[in-house]
Amino acid sequence: PPANSPRHCQMPAIPLRRSDMPRVFDHGARSYPLILGHEFSGVVDKVGEGVVSLSAGDHVVAAPLLPCGVCEDCLNGNYSLCSHYSFIGSRQNGAMAEYVVVPEANVVKIPNSLAMEQAATIEPATVALHAFKTSRFTAGKSVAVVGCGIIGLYAVQWARILGASEVTAIGRGQNGLDAALRVGADRAVSTSGRTEKEMQGLLGDGFDYVFECSGADATIHLAIATVAKKGTVCLIGTPKQPLSFTVSQWEAINRKECWVTGSWMSYSAPFPGEEWTDSVRCMCSGELCSDPGLVYGVYPMSQAQAAFEAIRSGAAKGRVLLTNEL
């Protein structure tokens, strides 16, 4: 392996992300051929020359971002904003293989007692925590989380861990809403069959912080409609379609003088950041968990095509994981 690059043997599991679907089915890969997989846990197989913090046999997770390290954003610790980055699983080969090469700086050790399937979901936990840091969250405030996928469920848990006064989960699918209650939401409200006005009537307009984890037109509108005056809307979800706003929807931002901020990826100084070390710590302590009720299926690597098809067809109503045998 290259200097300062440990080599990892991939262990169960490598979660499939919906963001990978365009790369597989819609010519969305940046280059071809490309091995996907940016969320993973593993066991160090070999270490490169000069590696001092890792040894063969260590259980680890790894941050997929490969920042340049020399631009102004990197020097300021804003690695997520690096314009010259590479990324494991999208800009270079990822973890859906027997081995993947990762720089030493990207690797975070985990205890052997932490299940690999659980550890493999740490990356979305770091994304959720980064949003709380970006939005300058303070304890004692009310939180709404819009969208109950994996990042939304971790946002619910971080809200509780970081001292929110109350946590409301908002979503469409009942599985996600049920999971949100299991992991710590005080209440879960379904958007199914309800207009924005009806939702606002149910929720009011008093949330101090709203974390939008879907990226859909309607959920962004709802986040703005239900945030408190002088409150904060943090946009985590990535839109897949053009967005539109009515005059009154946009004017609500002005009239409430609310703060709308984006949050991108999950890194801070020293790289990869507290987002990663805190997520590992809280997962090991049991404060943070990946709800098992949201796992649709576990597939061996030899059945990867079937796993991707389950997501594309809509059959998968939860997380899909690929596994490797050691």
Feature-to-residue mapping (PLM):
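Glycine-rich beta-strand-centered segment in the early N-terminal region that forms part
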Residues: P2-I14, F25-E72, P111-S113
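Short, surface-exposed secondary-structure boundary micro-motifs
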Residues: P12-A13, E49, L65, Y79, ...
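NAD(P)H dinucleotide-binding glycine-rich loop of Rossmann-like/cofactor-binding domains
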Residues: C68-V146
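Mid-domain Rossmann-like dinucleotide-binding core that forms the NAD(H)/NADP(H) cofactor-binding site
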Residues: L114-G193
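Glycine-rich cofactor phosphate-binding loops and adjacent beta1-alpha1 units
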Residues: S135-A139, D178-C258
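C-terminal substrate-binding/catalytic core of Rossmann-like NAD(P)-dependent dehydrogenases/reductases
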Residues: K197-Q200, G204, L243-V295, A306
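C-terminal hydrophobic helical "lid"/dimerization subdomain
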Residues: H221-A225, E274-L326
